[in-house]
Structures are given as structure tokens and as C-alpha cells.
Amino acid sequence: ETKSGMVLIIGYMNKDALDQTILTKQGHYWSRSREVLWKKGESSGMVHNVDDILIDDDQDSIWLKVTIEGLGASCHVGYKSCFYRSVNKIDNGEVTLNFTETEKVFDPEVVYPGADNPTKL
């Protein structure tokens, strides 16, 4: 996110997704599981408006700095970022996840009624 510097998502792009992102200045991505080009916010209204596009040194990774429309979240389960948990290792070797975001921005059942949620909580 442009304002906070927060990483919102890791998305995949093909040439069409990159072309559409540059053309429209809105985040477009390639869904590897559905094999379809999609625009972030197409169904939720939480569009990624692109403020800047950065390319890494060997030109195989792209970082979009974005401003989010609508409710201001990027994660389909309701959090601002898809990275809302951190790994915590406990002394006995058990690994747990700690929530770094404790409040959801929206209720996914309201925004995506009837949609399956593949995320493990």
C-alpha cells in the first residue's frame, strides 16, 4: 500500500495482466488456479489503484504501490493485508500462528455471499 508501505498481497501476473495494469492503472492479476485474468476489486469494489510500478534488478518481479478503493482491504477473508498472521515458535517445538491484524475490515460472507473460502484459519 502506498501510504503505509504494507504488503497487501502476493499476486501473479502474465503479460496480459501487466498490460492491463499499465493501461488502466488498476491492479490486474493472473489466477493460476482458475486460469483467468482478474481485476482486484471486480466483485468486492476494493480495487487496487496503482500509484507506482517498481521492477526488480533482473526484471522478473513487480511491486505495485497501490491505494485501495472501497472498504480498504485486500484479503478476501476480510483483513487489510493477506499477511495478517506471523509464525511463532514455542519452546516445545510447536509452531503457531499469531494474528498481526486482530480486526477484520469487512465480513467476507457479506461481500462474497455464497463463495467458497479456501483459506485455512
Roles of regions detected by a PLM:
Residues 1-121:
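Flexible "arm" and connector segments at domain edges
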